[in-house]
């Protein structure tokens, strides 16, 4: 038997993991083993909301060292993270300023300013990226306006996965899929857009030309002295998750479900017409030149905050209690920007219901029911928008990522959307990360080849829509007339 051992470092907004993948060439089987899992979260520092990148780096190194201590020879390493955030470095590679998180309020008002000064359509035609108030475009503008004293010291700006790869290898890289989330990459040239960079106040010299997934950035020297290639995978975690989505045919849509919910489809061409602009559709970069035509949905962030505020540790028990409640008594729009980072999520949800003359969710189960029903209804809205955009309905929806373990939400999604839902794999970002590594090692031909491996090895569960469910009746009778507010558009 011929084996490959690849390590995926997968960092999310709430947690991170170092995973070891073992690929057997002859039987084309792939197994994952968790080596190290650790928490991630927002911190308050000098008036900013920040990430603790030093702690994350220590956790990454701890996980890698654990693999080496087992005597396993690693063939390659890949790192994926969330998008838009960055770390600034000086000429010596030392950090400049703080690693500010996208949920910080420093960008307030800057998106509207950009649209007024540059033109909303022009920005969209250049980047193809949706308007979100925390995009890197506005973060850099906030930096240059609010902290001009830092500018003379900045030599490089690295997005999060590129920063951690740099810390392992000493080599800098700007990976394409994550770079597109910045709203600074020109959709026609796949390079940084000079007009958008100029408005942001950033110097183009801070960035290198984006590279597509599959190149070796450099090498990490393990404690035993071996040089291990660090591969530029599809380093935006959603891009990796889509690679591992076992999409079958052109009528399959995906939903990457986690802190954020990203719903979309793959396309060989971007959608940047007026319909796409009005719907705030994004065209993020994917592997092999494909576009991830998708829409951001606030996702399980709302639930994560409720769990934290209410100190709930038993999620299965909460879901069980939630399932016993009637559907659609409390409906909010999860994409309202009031939910980006409120002081207390529970109070914000209750206020939204009060302002719309609905019953007020009081118990933990009622709050969760409100979130699940509202997400499922928004999923139905977005799926309909995407189908209209491309002029063809979808036949099935693949839900991947940690959120696909929520069987109640999966069934609500199937019922609200009226479509077959296939849930899994859970560790989609990790698997997609591994997939690019295996292609770089010449073990697999392309993304479609890798998806065949995923389809035969992953644990997938099908949810069939129930047209007689409460939420299906709600969609048919009431929800179809509802207008949903765009997320920060």
Swiss-Prot record:
The UniProt record lists the keyword Magnesium: yes
Keywords: ATP-binding, Disulfide bond, Kinase, Magnesium, Nucleotide-binding, Rhamnose metabolism, Transferase
UniProt cofactor(s): Mg(2+)
Cofactor binding notes: It can also use manganese, cobalt, iron, calcium and copper ions.
Catalysed reactions, as listed in the record: L-rhamnulose + ATP = L-rhamnulose 1-phosphate + ADP + H(+)
pH dependence statement: Optimum pH is 8.5.
UniProt-annotated binding residues for substrate: 83, 236-238, 296
GO biological process, one term: rhamnose catabolic process
Active-site residues (renumbered): 237 (proton acceptor)
UniProt effect for mutating residue 73 to A: Same kinase activity as the wild-type
Binding-site positions, ATP: 13-17, 259, 304, 402
Enzyme Commission number: 2.7.1.5
Quaternary structure annotation from Swiss-Prot or TrEMBL: Monomer.
Functional description taken from the UniProt entry: Involved in the catabolism of L-rhamnose (6-deoxy-L-mannose). It could also play a role in the metabolism of some rare sugars such as L-fructose. Catalyzes the transfer of the gamma-phosphate group from ATP to the 1-hydroxyl group of L-rhamnulose to yield L-rhamnulose 1-phosphate. Uridine triphosphate (UTP), cytidine 5-triphosphate (CTP), guanosine 5-triphosphate (GTP), and thymidine triphosphate (TTP) also can act as phosphoryl donors. It can also phosphorylate L-fuculose and L-xylulose.
Similarity field: Belongs to the rhamnulokinase family.
Protein name: L-Rhamnulokinase
Species in which this protein is naturally found: Escherichia coli (strain K12)
Gene that produces this protein: rhaB
